[in-house]
Amino acid sequence: MGAYRYVQELYRKKQSDVMRYLLRIRVWQYRQMTRFHRAPRPSRPDKARRLGYKAKQGFSIFRIRVRRGGRKRPVPKGCTYGKPKSHGVNQLKPYRCLQSVAEERVGRRLGGLRVLNSYWVAQDAAHKYFEVIMVDPAHNAIRRDPNVNWICNAVHKHRELRGLTSAGKSSRGLGKGYRYSQTIGGSRRACWRRRNRLHLRRYR
């Protein structure tokens, strides 16, 4: 078993004395830093490598802090309109996970880089901390690497804003089987469009 395998097993037992101490120290350290900053190296090298990170030119790690809790509905001057059933403002739950929100915020700040993936690093009562793996599509080390140069294509710009990363896909309801009948055809919208379209068959 390699060294990364041992590190992976450590992170599976987050309630152990070692991990509780380590995460407590790290959360304190992250709390002193700004909300968004570049990390010199990944805090979880085993996880980063499993998600595609390489310690080479063109790859970078950015750490971001996201506020925990539900999403308050943005209503101007408290005007919700419609029927009382849809007047809720406070107790609404967001469709997307906080990890997907973190990827989006990093991607917006760094428009010239591409979001490859992200992972959880720590959390406290008020915030969750994620590290996002960014790739520079203009760097020659990336463009010449056959394993990762797919991300240089223009079609992969802002993958995080279109739900194409691992965290983004989790909230799209994609899958196979009877539980995922609401996304047959590729997406919720495609499924709705197919079911609600008027089909006028021509019989000859």
UniProtKB/Swiss-Prot annotation:
InterPro entries on file: Rbsml_eL15_core_dom_sf, Ribosomal_eL15, Ribosomal_eL15_CS, Ribosomal_uL23/eL15/eS24_sf
For this UniProt record, the keywords arranged alphabetically read as follows: Ribonucleoprotein, Ribosomal protein
GO CC, one annotated term: cytosolic large ribosomal subunit
Query: Which one of the record's GO molecular function terms can you name?
Result: RNA binding
- Top-rank taxon: Eukaryota
**Is Ribonucleoprotein set as a keyword in this record?**
yes
One Pfam short name: Ribosomal_L15e
Q: Might you name a Gene Ontology BP term for this protein?
A: cytoplasmic translation
Q: Does the keyword Ribonucleoprotein apply?
A: yes
Family that this chain belongs to: Belongs to the eukaryotic ribosomal protein eL15 family.
- What protein am I looking at? Large ribosomal subunit protein eL15
**Which gene underlies this protein?**
RpL15
